[in-house]
Amino acid sequence: MQKGPLSLATVSHTETFWRKVGPKRDGLGTGDGLHSWVLQEPVSTGDNPRECDSQGTSKDTLVREGKTYKCKECGKVFNKNSLLVRHHQIHAGVKTYECQECGKAFHEKVDFVRHMRIHSGEKPCKCVECGKVFNRRSHLLCYHQIHTGEKPYECSECGKTFSYHSVFIQHRMTHTGEKLFGCKECGKTFYYNSSLTRHMKIHTGEKPYKCGECGKTFTYHSVFFRHSMTHTAGKPYECKECGKGFYYSYSLTRHTRSHTGEKPYECLEHRKAFGYHSAFAQQSKIHSGGKNL
């Protein structure tokens, strides 16, 4: 399709730009490659006027010549003015998309759409191995490694391997003891800012995840996800010794100790060992004079 000239310079840094649009895509597939171009409304990007030497230059030429737009706040660069305008909204605190269910707001439409799946229960991403469905493609990709057994990340300190890079990085910090993020409410420290953000929900009481089956709400998505499994038929984790089923893998691990006799928790005061951490913690509390460890 023939595209006309593209004007990028107006007074007071107000710029007109073209936006590329294409066919709607699903969560996992790709488009058919057919796109069109539409003219956006002029958008002001700040109070600093500047001259642009690209009047009459097509968008394709701008990309080929390496024309970039730089954010004066953080230095991030973009090859499209439209992306810079959208990026500026982050610094300005503008959140265009607001959820009518819970009031949470988002900068980007794609984040808003993902969030709405929490309320609607929509799960468009399906595992081809077992049929399990997810509301995000990233969750599906992580889950799929259960079937492949792939653990490409190995700790050089202890040799332990991990399926996910984020878990591997967090494990590495357990060797260094480094915790960078502290809670201002209670002083608890964390390896990651994301962990601190999750922790803060305890203080705020926020429970954004609601079960569509029973209405129960949860602070964390992981707990909500495990709870949702209780409504599905069957218990995926089964004991090979007695056939008892469990919803969670850690429950099966605890149960297996009743068959193996394993007692991994040892009290250093009188060398007594325990099969479960809860029993060990109770014993340790006695030695510490009733103080929580």
Swiss-Prot record:
Alphabetical keyword list: DNA-binding, Metal-binding, Nucleus, Repeat, Transcription, Transcription regulation, Zinc, Zinc-finger
- Please give the chief subcellular localization of this protein: nucleus
Naming one, the record's GO cellular component terms include:
nucleus
Q: Which residues belong to zinc fingers classed as C2H2-type? A: 69-91, 97-119, 125-147, 153-175, 181-203, 209-231, 237-259
State its location(s): Nucleus
Q: Which GO terms describe its molecular function?
A: DNA-binding transcription factor activity, RNA polymerase II-specific; RNA polymerase II transcription regulatory region sequence-specific DNA binding; zinc ion binding
Disulfide-bonded cysteine pairs: these are: none
Q: Name one GO biological process term.
A: regulation of transcription by RNA polymerase II
The family this protein is said to belong to:
Belongs to the krueppel C2H2-type zinc-finger protein family.
Q: What does this protein do?
A: May be involved in transcriptional regulation.
- For this entry, the protein name equals Zinc finger protein 80
Q: Which organism is it from?
A: Macaca mulatta (Rhesus macaque)
